Protein backbone atom coordinates (compact mmCIF):
# COMPACT_ATOMS: atom_id res chain seq x y z
CA UNK A 1 0.00 0.00 0.00
CA UNK A 2 2.75 2.44 0.90
CA UNK A 3 4.41 2.02 -2.51
CA UNK A 4 1.55 1.36 -4.90
CA UNK A 5 -1.42 3.31 -3.53
CA UNK A 6 -0.69 6.08 -1.08
CA UNK A 7 2.07 7.96 -2.97
CA UNK A 8 -0.30 8.58 -5.87
CA UNK A 9 -2.98 10.19 -3.69
CA UNK A 10 -5.88 8.83 -5.74
CA UNK A 11 -9.32 10.39 -5.53
CA UNK A 12 -10.87 6.95 -5.89
CA UNK A 13 -9.73 3.43 -5.17
CA UNK A 14 -11.68 0.52 -6.63
CA UNK A 15 -10.55 -2.80 -5.29
CA UNK A 16 -11.49 -6.43 -5.01
CA UNK A 17 -10.06 -8.36 -2.11
CA UNK A 18 -10.71 -11.49 -0.08
CA UNK A 19 -11.68 -14.03 -2.72
CA UNK A 20 -8.64 -16.23 -2.22
CA UNK A 21 -8.92 -15.86 1.54
CA UNK A 22 -12.32 -17.54 1.75
CA UNK A 23 -10.57 -20.87 1.31
CA UNK A 24 -8.41 -20.23 4.37
CA UNK A 25 -9.00 -21.22 7.96
CA UNK A 26 -9.48 -17.77 9.49
CA UNK A 27 -13.08 -17.35 8.40
CA UNK A 28 -15.10 -14.25 7.68
CA UNK A 29 -13.91 -12.29 10.72
CA UNK A 30 -10.26 -12.36 9.68
CA UNK A 31 -11.05 -11.39 6.11
CA UNK A 32 -13.20 -8.47 7.25
CA UNK A 33 -10.48 -7.33 9.65
CA UNK A 34 -7.85 -7.15 6.88
CA UNK A 35 -10.15 -5.31 4.50
CA UNK A 36 -11.13 -2.92 7.28
CA UNK A 37 -7.46 -2.27 8.04
CA UNK A 38 -6.89 -1.33 4.40
CA UNK A 39 -9.90 0.98 4.36
CA UNK A 40 -8.95 2.59 7.67
CA UNK A 41 -5.36 3.16 6.58
CA UNK A 42 -6.43 4.76 3.32
CA UNK A 43 -8.82 7.04 5.17
CA UNK A 44 -6.24 7.99 7.81
CA UNK A 45 -3.64 8.98 5.20
CA UNK A 46 -5.95 10.16 2.41
CA UNK A 47 -9.17 11.37 4.07
CA UNK A 48 -10.57 12.78 0.80
CA UNK A 49 -10.20 9.47 -1.06
CA UNK A 50 -13.33 7.43 -1.81
CA UNK A 51 -12.98 3.67 -1.55
CA UNK A 52 -15.10 1.43 -3.77
CA UNK A 53 -15.06 -2.11 -2.46
CA UNK A 54 -16.17 -4.77 -4.93
CA UNK A 55 -18.00 -7.58 -3.13
CA UNK A 56 -16.45 -11.01 -3.09
CA UNK A 57 -17.95 -13.05 -5.90
CA UNK A 58 -20.01 -16.17 -5.33
CA UNK A 59 -18.08 -18.18 -7.89
CA UNK A 60 -19.37 -21.71 -8.54
CA UNK A 61 -15.90 -23.04 -7.72
CA UNK A 62 -16.29 -21.65 -4.19
CA UNK A 63 -19.84 -22.89 -3.62
CA UNK A 64 -18.80 -24.76 -0.48
CA UNK A 65 -17.57 -21.44 0.97
CA UNK A 66 -20.50 -19.22 -0.01
CA UNK A 67 -21.51 -18.85 3.64
CA UNK A 68 -18.13 -17.21 4.33
CA UNK A 69 -18.46 -15.06 1.20
CA UNK A 70 -21.96 -13.97 2.23
CA UNK A 71 -20.87 -13.17 5.77
CA UNK A 72 -17.93 -11.03 4.63
CA UNK A 73 -20.07 -9.25 2.06
CA UNK A 74 -22.91 -8.55 4.50
CA UNK A 75 -20.52 -7.09 7.06
CA UNK A 76 -18.74 -4.92 4.50
CA UNK A 77 -22.03 -3.75 3.00
CA UNK A 78 -23.19 -2.65 6.46
CA UNK A 79 -19.87 -0.93 7.09
CA UNK A 80 -20.12 0.95 3.80
CA UNK A 81 -23.68 2.04 4.61
CA UNK A 82 -22.37 3.75 7.75
CA UNK A 83 -19.32 5.22 6.04
CA UNK A 84 -18.89 8.56 4.34
CA UNK A 85 -16.00 7.31 2.19
CA UNK A 86 -16.72 3.65 1.33
CA UNK A 87 -19.04 2.49 -1.43
CA UNK A 88 -19.96 -1.19 -1.62
CA UNK A 89 -20.37 -2.54 -5.14
CA UNK A 90 -22.13 -5.88 -5.42
CA UNK A 91 -21.56 -7.55 -8.76
CA UNK A 92 -23.03 -10.87 -7.67
CA UNK A 93 -26.55 -10.23 -9.00
CA UNK A 94 -25.32 -10.24 -12.62
CA UNK A 95 -23.68 -13.63 -12.09
CA UNK A 96 -27.04 -15.36 -11.66
CA UNK A 97 -30.15 -15.53 -13.83
CA UNK A 98 -33.71 -14.77 -12.71
CA UNK A 99 -34.14 -18.28 -11.34
CA UNK A 100 -30.99 -18.03 -9.23
CA UNK A 101 -28.95 -20.31 -11.47
CA UNK A 102 -25.31 -19.45 -12.13
CA UNK A 103 -24.75 -17.80 -15.50
CA UNK A 104 -22.05 -20.26 -16.55
CA UNK A 105 -21.46 -18.38 -19.81
CA UNK A 106 -19.69 -15.70 -17.76
CA UNK A 107 -17.06 -18.12 -16.41
CA UNK A 108 -14.05 -19.90 -17.77
CA UNK A 109 -14.16 -23.71 -17.48
CA UNK A 110 -12.62 -23.49 -14.00
CA UNK A 111 -15.88 -21.91 -12.73
CA UNK A 112 -13.79 -19.29 -10.94
CA UNK A 113 -12.30 -16.85 -13.42
CA UNK A 114 -14.37 -14.65 -15.68
CA UNK A 115 -14.77 -14.41 -19.43
CA UNK A 116 -14.98 -11.03 -21.21
CA UNK A 117 -18.82 -10.86 -21.13
CA UNK A 118 -18.67 -10.80 -17.32
CA UNK A 119 -16.54 -7.68 -17.42
CA UNK A 120 -19.09 -5.98 -19.65
CA UNK A 121 -21.70 -6.71 -16.96
CA UNK A 122 -19.38 -5.45 -14.21
CA UNK A 123 -18.66 -2.23 -16.08
CA UNK A 124 -22.39 -1.48 -16.18
CA UNK A 125 -22.34 -1.41 -12.36
CA UNK A 126 -18.95 0.10 -11.60
CA UNK A 127 -18.85 2.86 -14.20
CA UNK A 128 -22.04 4.68 -13.09
CA UNK A 129 -20.88 4.58 -9.46
CA UNK A 130 -17.57 6.16 -10.41
CA UNK A 131 -19.22 8.72 -12.69
CA UNK A 132 -21.56 9.77 -9.91
CA UNK A 133 -18.72 10.05 -7.41
CA UNK A 134 -16.65 12.03 -9.91
CA UNK A 135 -19.52 14.45 -10.51
CA UNK A 136 -19.99 14.93 -6.77
CA UNK A 137 -16.26 15.56 -6.19
CA UNK A 138 -16.12 18.68 -8.32
Where are the regions that the model predicts?
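Alpha-helical cap/lid subdomain in secreted, periplasmic
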Residues: 1-138
Amino acid sequence: MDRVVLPFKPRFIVYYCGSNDVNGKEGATGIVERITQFNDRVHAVLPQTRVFFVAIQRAPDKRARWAVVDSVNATLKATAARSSYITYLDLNPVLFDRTGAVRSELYKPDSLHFLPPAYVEFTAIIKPALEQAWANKR
